[in-house]
């Protein structure tokens, strides 16, 4: 979901795992050579979703990479179809007021621009919560008063508990513990 901390947490998780990190929004900006926000404003959400799909196809071929998807990526079946089974999907859940606070600080295009930010987020979540949760292998609640490094440790421990890493990998990640 938009504003949940995907990039901040993803970057630090990748560092801990010693894996590369990719962010869908940054990849879009790189490919467009400008902000994806401009694409949405100039050509609309359909053009955005087409580029998103193209990048998701590229992501689906990556191995051992932490990827921060866009907040709405999994709401579209064509994206989940190509991403399903390619890795572990982690949903970062947050309460709507925290999301609104974070989104308000960023210049993000709105899905429902005719309503308040809170109503926009509520509509997105209520229409897609089952999709988000259905795609997730792990659901982590970010509104627990923890720092990003603490959240990364929690997520790493959840990944370990699901036996998703080898002993060698766990040893490597322990050397990169985030303080």
Which residues does each predicted region cover?
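ATP-dependent small-molecule kinase phosphotransfer cores
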Residues: 23-82, 109
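NTP-dependent small-molecule kinase module
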Residues: 12, 16, 126-166, 170
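Short, flexible helix/strand-to-coil boundary loops that buttress conserved ligand/catalytic motifs
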Residues: 32, 52, 60, 102-103, ...
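A glycine- and Lys/Arg-enriched "phosphate-lid" helix/loop adjacent to the NTP-binding pocket
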Residues: 85-130
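P-loop (Walker A) phosphate-binding loop of NTP-binding proteins
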Residues: 1
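Short glycine-rich anion-binding loops that position phosphate/pyrophosphate groups of nucleotides
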Residues: 71-74, 95-97, 145
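Well-ordered beta-strand positions
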Residues: 65, 88, 137-138
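Walker A/P-loop
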Residues: 7
